[in-house]
Amino acid sequence: MSKKYTQQQYEKYLAQPANNTFGLSPQQVADWFMGQAGARPVINSYGVNASNLVSTYIPKMQEYGVSYTLFLMYTVFEGGGAGNWINHYMYDTGSNGLECLEHDLQYIHGVWETYFPPALSAPECYPATEDNAGALDRFYQSLPGRTWGDVMIPSTMAGNAWVWAYNYCVNNQGAAPLVYFGNPYDSQIDSLLAMGADPFTGGSITGDGKNPSVGTGNATVSASSEANREKLKKALTDLFNNNLEHLSGEFYGNQVLNAMKYGTILKCDLTDDGLNAILQLIADVNLQTNPNPDKPTVQSPGQNDLGSGSDRVAANLANAQAQVGKYIGDGQCYAWVGWWSARVCGYSISYSTGDPMLPLIGDGMNAHSIHLGWDWSIANTGIVNYPVGTVGRKEDLRVGAIWCATAFSGAPFYTGQYGHTGIIESWSDTTVTVLEQNILGSPVIRSTYDLNTFLSTLTGLITFK
C-alpha cells in the first residue's frame, strides 16, 4: 500500500494560489458540482442549481478572491450543508445559502490573515503522529500566502494525516477514534484530472475541459462490453442499496459506508470493504473479457509447498492467536478471515490485507456468504453449506475453519444484514471458542459461546484440506 500521489505532487497541489480556477469555466464546474453525491446536502439545504451557482454563488466566491473550482471541491468532499457549505461550523450561521457561503468565505480570509496550526487531530479521532516530526508545519510555513494549502492545512485533518502521517494512518485503521477516513486531497486531485485540469502546475491539460484520461479511439462499444457495463451498474446499485445502522453516539455505518452525524446531515465515507468490493466487481467485469476466463488472474504459492491443511493450520494458529488485541486489515471481520486464509492457503478475500486474492464467483460483500462467494476450489479447501432452515453440525467443525454466521442472527452475535465471520480455535461438548474481529468495532478478540447457539447461526464453513 502506498500514497496515490508523490509527496512532491501533493505539495505542488497545495501550493497553488487559492484563486486558481485551473482554466475551468464556471459552467463546467457548476455542472460537475451538480453531479456529485457530496453536493446533495448543499443542493437540498439551499436550493442550489447550476443556474444560480453561475449567476449568484460563484460571483460571490470571485468577489472574495476564492477559486470556485477549489471551493466547490472542498464543499463536495466535506459533504457540506450541515454547517454552511464546507462544514467548518457545526450549524448554519446564516439564514440562507448566500449568507452561509459568505460566512465560509470570511472564515477563509481569517485563516489567511491569522496563523492557525496545521490540523492533525479532530474531535472524533486520536491525534495523528507525523512520519517526520514537524514536516507538515515546515511546509505550511513555507507557503507564500493565500494558497490552497493555507486554506486546507489548518482546516482538515484527513488529508494532512494521509500525506504527512501516512504510517500512522496505515497502522491505525478502524472505526473512530481510529483512522476511518480517506484522503480528501486524493479526491480533489482526481476530480481536477477528470475535468481536464493539471493539479500540479495549475493549468489545463487539454485546454478544452475534456477528460485527459479518455482517448478518442474507436467509439464503437461491443455488445459484450455493454453487457458487462450493465452488470457492473446493477452490482454497484445492489451494493449501495442497504440501510445505515446506528452504531453509537453520532456514528452510523454498514459494510459499505461509515457515517458521522452533523446536525441533520450524515457525512459519509466509503469503507475499505466497500472499495474492495467495487474493485473486485471491476476486476470481475475485466475477467469476463479474458480469452481464458477459467484461469485465475492471481497467483499464489503452490499448494504442495504449503503442506497439508492441518499442517498449515497448526503452523499458523499461534500467529493468529498473537493478533488478539490488534486490528487486521481494514478492521472488518471479513479482513480478519482474509488475513487467515492467506496464511493457510495462500489467498485472501480482502484487498486490505495486501495478499493475492481468490477469484470472486458470487456474493463478495456479505460475511454470511463467504463460503459461496469465492472460488475456494483453487485453494484446496472444503466447503460445508447449511441451507436456510438447517443448523450447523458439531461433526463438521475443524480447528482453523472459517465460519460464516447468518444475517440478523440474534444471540450470540446479534448480526446485521451482513452476517459475521471468524476462525474456530477450539470446541468442547458445550462451548466453542473463536477468534473474531469487529464485534462492535473491536480488534481481534477471543470469544467463547454456547455450542448449540453458535451452530444455530451458521450458514457455512470453510475447512483446509
Swiss-Prot record:
<feature type="domain" description="Peptidase C51">
    <location>
        <begin position="308"/>
        <end position="465"/>
    </location>
</feature>
<feature type="compositionally biased region" description="Polar residues">
    <location>
        <begin position="289"/>
        <end position="307"/>
    </location>
</feature>
<dbReference type="InterPro" id="IPR007921">
    <property type="entry name" value="CHAP_dom"/>
</dbReference>
<keyword id="KW-1188">Viral release from host cell</keyword>
<feature type="active site" description="For amidase activity">
    <location>
        <position position="420"/>
    </location>
</feature>
<keyword id="KW-0929">Antimicrobial</keyword>
<feature type="region of interest" description="Disordered">
    <location>
        <begin position="204"/>
        <end position="226"/>
    </location>
</feature>
<protein>
    <recommendedName>
        <fullName>Endolysin PlyC, large catalytic subunit</fullName>
        <ecNumber>3.2.1.-</ecNumber>
        <ecNumber>3.5.1.28</ecNumber>
    </recommendedName>
</protein>
<dbReference type="InterPro" id="IPR048974">
    <property type="entry name" value="PlyCA_N"/>
</dbReference>
<feature type="active site" description="For amidase activity">
    <location>
        <position position="333"/>
    </location>
</feature>
<feature type="region of interest" description="Glycosidase activity">
    <location>
        <begin position="2"/>
        <end position="205"/>
    </location>
</feature>
<dbReference type="Pfam" id="PF21480">
    <property type="entry name" value="PlyCA_N"/>
</dbReference>
<keyword id="KW-0378">Hydrolase</keyword>
<comment type="function">
    <text>Component of the endolysin PlyC that degrades the host peptidoglycans and participates with the holin protein in the sequential events which lead to the programmed host cell lysis releasing the mature viral particles. Once the holin has permeabilized the host cell membrane, the endolysin can reach the periplasm and breaking down the peptidoglycan layer. When associated with the small subunit PlyCB, the large subunit PlyCA displays 2 catalytic activities, amidase and glycosyl hydrolase. Cleaves the amide bond between N-acetyl muramic acid and L-alanine in the host peptidoglycan.</text>
</comment>
<keyword id="KW-0578">Host cell lysis by virus</keyword>
<comment type="subunit">
    <text>Part of the PlyC holoenzyme, which is composed of 1 PlyCA and 8 PlyCB assembled as a ring.</text>
</comment>
<feature type="compositionally biased region" description="Polar residues">
    <location>
        <begin position="213"/>
        <end position="226"/>
    </location>
</feature>
<dbReference type="GO" id="GO:0031640">
    <property type="term" value="P:killing of cells of another organism"/>
</dbReference>
<dbReference type="Pfam" id="PF05257">
    <property type="entry name" value="CHAP"/>
</dbReference>
<feature type="region of interest" description="Disordered">
    <location>
        <begin position="289"/>
        <end position="309"/>
    </location>
</feature>
<keyword id="KW-0204">Cytolysis</keyword>
<dbReference type="GO" id="GO:0016787">
    <property type="term" value="F:hydrolase activity"/>
</dbReference>
